[in-house]
Amino acid sequence: MSDDDFLLRLEAALARHTGKPAKVHDLQRLTGGANRTTMSFDVGGADPGEPRRQCILQLGTQTFDSVVGMVPQITPAEQARVMIAAARVGAPAPRVIAILEPADALGEGYITARVAGETLGARIVRDERFAAARRVMARQCGEILAAIHRIDPGEAPFLMRQDAAAHVAAHRSIVDNYNFKLPALELALRWAAENVPRNQRLTVLHGDFRTGNMIVGEEGIRCVLDWELAQAGDPMQDLGWLCIRTWRFGGAGPVGGFGSREDLFAAYERASGHPVDPAHVRFWEAFGNVKWAVDCLLLGTRGIEEVGIERSAIGRRIEEPLWDFFDLIESRE
């Protein structure tokens, strides 16, 4: 498809979904890969004097691996539906303008309003302009996660449901099927299987709530991005994933590189009405490192087949999350 044809189809899709004539300006590709593309653009109406709206177009296809498919992943249309549900309960999700349909002839995807701000983790946890934001972000994370966990699972019946034991078993199967042989990883998976927490609630989860997947301004968190791993499961999983060292980007705070666990837990308890057991979250923080270690191996394996080196470089980092896992369970942090 030529660039001109793509532009015409995008304008037609906007007009179809909004009921208004649309003129697209400044279409730019922000990221692109084999299965996912993000573009930004401005849209105006028929009147040249009409204010433009800043938008984001997400295009993607769901790839299926019979082994990796045992862990949650949803389609672009399903992501958009979860974001709509999240916004209804007060979570700062992108405002969905349109969910693409076959008649739009653009592929799978959705269009949202664009939110200004910073997403790069290293800047968020280090730049002086975000110093005030860092003081409130752990509290904001607790409040946002409490809101996400209030989503009615009935609004997203397509979400995979997995408790902690199922997550551990799925990653055990991935390691076995890909024939990854690392003694440290074997020991970590055994620890996880033997320490599955009891009394797990079932809620909708973001699935990848962390620094780097949120838009931040000087006042704090403006928007939560990257909902493709949304699922139904133990809500403490979201809290633990936010705390793993990888997502601190060199920042000092154990929560995302910017805050304390105490602030996160207290805010979550106030907003949700549910108590937080630090040991329960600690399991998910520890197992989060195991999951990331498995992801590093998977990305490294796929990187061998690609031209770029980014995935291969991630594959070489497997020792980091495994070190963090053992450091955490031995309580040296």
Regions found by a protein language model. Name each.
Residues D238-G273, F287-E306:
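Active-site activation/catalytic loop segments of kinase-like enzymes and analogous catalytic loops
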Residues Q28-A164, V168-A169, S173-A188, N195-R201:
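ATP-binding pocket architecture of kinase catalytic cores
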Residues L225-A230:
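Activation of the activation-loop gatekeeper triad in protein kinase-fold domains
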